Curated annotation (Swiss-Prot):
Similarity-based family: Belongs to the PsaF family.
Any single biological process term in GO: photosynthesis
Keyword set, alphabetical order: Chloroplast, Membrane, Photosynthesis, Photosystem I, Plastid, Signal, Thylakoid, Transmembrane, Transmembrane helix
Pfam families to which the protein is assigned, alphabetical: PSI_PsaF (PF02507)
Function of the protein: Probably participates in efficiency of electron transfer from plastocyanin to P700 (or cytochrome c553 in algae and cyanobacteria). This plastocyanin-docking protein contributes to the specific association of plastocyanin to PSI.
Annotated signal peptide: 1-20
Highest taxon, organism lineage: Eukaryota
Compartment annotation: Plastid, Chloroplast thylakoid membrane
Protein name: Photosystem I reaction center subunit III
InterPro entries membership: PSI_PsaF (IPR003666), PSI_PsaF_sf (IPR036577)
Length: 181
């Protein structure tokens, strides 16, 4: 009985069964709406380009932008991204490792950046708490001090692990106030 339940659970949760095309998503290179978006984007840029003489700085900039637009759309098409009926690429996070690069790297980068911001802010607040006017330094930032913390924040995962393993990261129970209720 338990083996049957386990087998049924494995079959139902198999990520290979999940098919994004069923949800109305198609590869961007095959999407008519995606190709229409590219054509419309290029047409708008070409309409702006027609207002300028050739070899002028605005015309050169617009030509460069047209090439970048074509390259961007071609890259999306080659990357195997899936597009919806709106012609926009959609990220799929259904557990297939073939789609992991679409969201794992940006997700890890987001966590790193938010951790950096939090670690730098924590360091700044702990530092200004030791000054004579900590509230004032929280409202009016001490920019040189903040820059010092910002420049050292890139190694925050190592610093956090070091403080955690030494016991400095977590406050002792005696330092935590408890409500009398």
């Amino acid at each position: 009985m338990c083996l049957t339940c386990l087998l049924a659970l494995l079959i139902m949760s198999n990520p290979i069964i999940a098919n994004a095309e069923v949800a109305g998503l198609v590869p961007c290179k095959d999407s008519a709406a995606f190709n229409k978006r590219m054509v419309n984007s290029v047409k708008k840029l070409q309409a702006r380009l027609a207002k300028y003489d050739a070899d002028t700085p605005p015309a050169l900039a617009l030509n460069k932008q047209i090439e970048k637009t074509k390259t961007r759309f071609a890259t999306y098409g080659r990357a195997g991204l899936l597009c919806g009926t709106d012609g926009l690429p959609h990220l799929i996070s259904d557990g297939r490792w073939s789609r992991a690069g679409d969201f794992v790297f940006p997700g890890l980068l987001f966590l790193y950046i938010t951790g950096w911001i939090g670690w730098v802010g924590r360091g700044y607040l702990l530092s200004v708490a030791k000054t004579s006017k900590p509230t004032e330094k929280e409202i009016i930032l001490d920019v040189p001090l903040a820059i010092k913390f910002m420049s050292s924040g890139f190694a925050w995962p190592l610093a956090a692990w070091q403080e955690f393993s030494s016991g400095q990261l977590i406050a002792s129970n005696d330092d935590i106030t408890v409500s009398p209720r």
